[in-house]
Amino acid sequence: MTQLKYLLLVSRQGKIRLKKWYTAMSAGEKAKIVKDLTPTILARKPKMCNIIEYNDHKVVYKRYASLYFIVGMTPDVDNELLTLEIIHRFVETMDTYFGNVCELDIIFNFSKVYDILNEMIMCDGSIAESSRKEVLHHVTVMDTMESNDNLERVLS
């Protein structure tokens, strides 16, 4: 069973575009992780291994276009290749939802990105749903409910 500690989306310029923490940490610990990992991963060459060790856990990352998807995982429990597959499935799901997702989609629609992520990964960092079709169905239902709620507010 996969147990994620955190997921970060970082641009090539080193700006955090999205972060989700699945393990309780102090603000200082979170800031240190971001501060340490961002330049380390950005400096790595494309042909280098996508798995690095950091303190007490492993970090798996993958670059898609101008974004780095960085995942911290528990070393004893997790499978690094499964974590890479989770990253890929997350990107595929966003790509289907947004239609060729880009960094601006994530910036301007971050709440939808969090919805997709929350449908895929539970709050403790374990996988909730791996089917892209199911995740998209749930997010679409949420969109419909949200638009109906907004319509009711306008009409009342």
From Swiss-Prot:
Pfam families in the record: Clat_adaptor_s (PF01217)
Subcellular location: Cytoplasm; Nucleus; Cytoplasmic vesicle, Clathrin-coated vesicle membrane; Endosome
Record-level Gene Ontology MF annotations: clathrin adaptor activity
Record has rRNA-binding as a keyword: no
Miscellaneous information on this protein: Present with 6370 molecules/cell in log phase SD medium.
Subunit relationships: Adapter protein complex 1 (AP-1) is a heterotetramer composed of two large adaptins (gamma-type subunit APL4 and beta-type subunit APL2), a medium adaptin (mu-type subunit APM1) and a small adaptin (sigma-type subunit APS1). AP-1 interacts with clathrin. Also a component of the AP-1R complex composed of at least APM2, APL4 and APS1.
Family in the record: Belongs to the adaptor complexes small subunit family.
Name of the protein in its database record: AP-1 complex subunit sigma-1
Source organism of this protein record: Saccharomyces cerevisiae (strain ATCC 204508 / S288c) (Baker's yeast)
Protein's gene: APS1
